[in-house]
Structure formats: structure tokens, C-alpha cells
A protein has these predicted regions:
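Class I SAM-dependent methyltransferase SAM/SAH-binding core
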Residues: 48-95
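A C-terminal cap/extension of S-adenosyl-L-methionine-dependent methyltransferases
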Residues: 158, 183, 187-192, 202-253
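Conserved class I S-adenosyl-L-methionine
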Residues: 1-36, 38-47, 50-54, 71-74, 137-165, 225-226
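A short glycine-rich, Lys/Arg-flanked "PGG" loop and its adjoining helix->strand segment in the class I
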Residues: 120-135
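A conserved beta-strand element that flanks and buttresses the S-adenosyl-L-methionine
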Residues: 108
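Acceptor-substrate binding/catalytic loop of class I
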Residues: 140, 174-189
Length: 253
């Protein structure tokens, strides 16, 4: 059965999104500074390998997983000369059935959680894959980002920032078409679920903080990314941006 992204040109989605991509690369590199040594990484939902260059320089072995045969084929072509990367077509829940558990120093999952409804099960699966003291870099779509909060305030919904339940932002047409869910999460829910699954939170970053078509037209990419780099840590406390990156560590019991 084809995966959802087999019927979608995901690489083209990233055309004209150099700022968003660069912001995510910067976030991963910043979080990696907290980890002294990484040998083996598994990236969940890694697609066509967009983010591999952001961490491959730090690791010896990489397993890139994705449900989409089409995206993995793109990744294989892109990294055909790399001996450190292996490719695995699998959904997250099936990964532990085909790879050794407690075998990875680091798991990375970016732009995946918004398609997952059972996040508790997802975090438990990641926990099983990680070795003792293993790390988890997670990205999630932030329900409470500043633009959404202002929009709800103007609409009279002053309790919006405190409503912890997730929101599926698909259109009615997409819901009727049974497309993948697209869920924005409250940061407090994510932190609570990670801790329940056996993780300690090491650091969070607010990402894509100045995402704006207007700013992209007005300023060069390097300038925007320099500003983004300066903002990711200071704005993490209020979860300002539409995307939040988390570094968590498997708790030692």
C-alpha cells in the first residue's frame, strides 16, 4: 500500500523555503552541542534526507527511516556515495520490529509528530530504540505560537494559550478526503508526555521565529538566519515560533 507521501512531491515543497530549512538546521546543530559523543543515529520520517547534513558530521552510522518508498528512493540517490547511511522503509510503530532496540545514541524526528495522533505510543517507541542515556531531538508544530495566540485573542478567545488539547488544522475538505492529520500541539502537553515516557528535557528552542513572506522579500537569507540564530534560545521560554525543537535524554532509572 503506498504511503501518503508517495503521492506528493515533498522535495518541491521546500522550494522557496530556504529560511525554514536553515532555521531547522541551525536548531539541530545547536542541540547537538549538548551531546558529547554520538555514534549511531536513527532519523524517523527522514524523507529524502533533507536534514542529514545537519548532523552527519557528528556521527558514524545513520539509519534513515520513512514510510514512503518514493522519498527513500530520492534519499538513496542523493547519498549513494555515503557508506555510513542505511535506509529503512517503515512506519514508526514497525521500526522496533526490524532494528535492534536500545541500539541508538540519538533519535531525530522532525516534521513528523504533526501527523501522529497517539504521541504517547510514539514516544514510548523512541524510548525503546535508545541506548542508556540516549538523546531524542524532537520537533513539533506549536499550537501556542504568537501569531495564533494574537489571532485568537482578537477573536475573543483569551483562554487559548492555556487550552492544552491539540488542534488538527486540516480543512474540512482535507478531513473528508481522509488526508493525514496535521496537528498543532500545546508545548505543555509535549513536555508532559515526554516526561511520562521516560525522558528528561534538556533544552528547547523556538524555531522559524521570523517566518514571513514579506521579510523574505525584504532581506537576504543570511541576514534572516543570523537573526533567527540569535532568537532561538531567548524566545524558547515563551515558545514564540510556529515550530519548537526539544532535546530530551532517556532517563536513568
Amino acid at each position: 500500500m503506498p504511503a501518503a507521501y508517495d503521492n506528493y512531491d515533498y522535495p518541491s515543497y521546500w522550494d522557496n523555503r530556504d529560511y525554514e530549512h536553515g532555521s531547522e538546521v541551525e536548531a539541530i546543530k545547536t542541540l547537538l552541542e549538548n551531546i558529547s559523543k554520538v555514534k549511531k543515529v536513527i532519523e524517523i520520517g527522514g524523507g529524502f534526507g533533507r536534514l542529514i547534513p545537519s548532523y552527519s558530521f557528528r556521527v558514524k552510522k545513520i539509519i534513515l527511516t520513512d514510510p514512503s518508498a518514493k522519498l527513500l528512493s530520492n534519499a538513496r540517490k542523493k547519498y549513494k556515495d555515503s557508506k555510513k547511511i542505511k535506509f529503512l522503509q517503515s512506519t514508526l510503530e514497525n521500526v522496533p520490529k526490524v532494528v535492534k532496540q536500545r541500539d541508538f545514541d540519538l533519535a531525530i524526528m522532525v516534521r513528523v509528530l504533526h501527523h501522529i495522533e497517539d504521541i504517547d505510543s510514539a514516544f514510548e517507541t523512541i524510548h525503546k530504540l535508545l541506548d542508556k542515556n540516549g538523546y531524542f531531538i524532537l520537533e513539533f508544530a506549536n499550537k501556542r505560537h504568537v501569531k495564533a495566540t494574537i489571532r485568537h485573542f482578537l477573536g475573543g478567545d483569551i483562554t487559548y494559550p492555556m487550552e492544552i488539547h491539540p488542534v488538527d488544522i486540516r480543512s474540512k475538505k482535507s478531513v473528508r478526503a481522509n488526508t493525514l492529520p496535521f496537528i498543532n500541539f500545546h508545548p505543555d502537553q509535549i513536555m508532559q508526555c515526554l516526561q511520562t515516557a521516560g525522558f528528561d528535557i534538556i533544552q528547547t528552542l523556538s524555531v522559524s521565529n521570523i517566518r514571513s513572506s514579506f521579510l523574505k522579500r525584504m532581506f537576504p537569507l543570511k541576514f534572516l538566519l543570523d537573526i533567527e540564530k540569535l532568537l532561538q534560545k531567548p524566545l524558547s521560554g515563551i515558545k514564540f515560533g510556529p515550530s519548537v525543537f526539544v532535546l530530551a535524554r532517556k532517563r536513568v532509572n
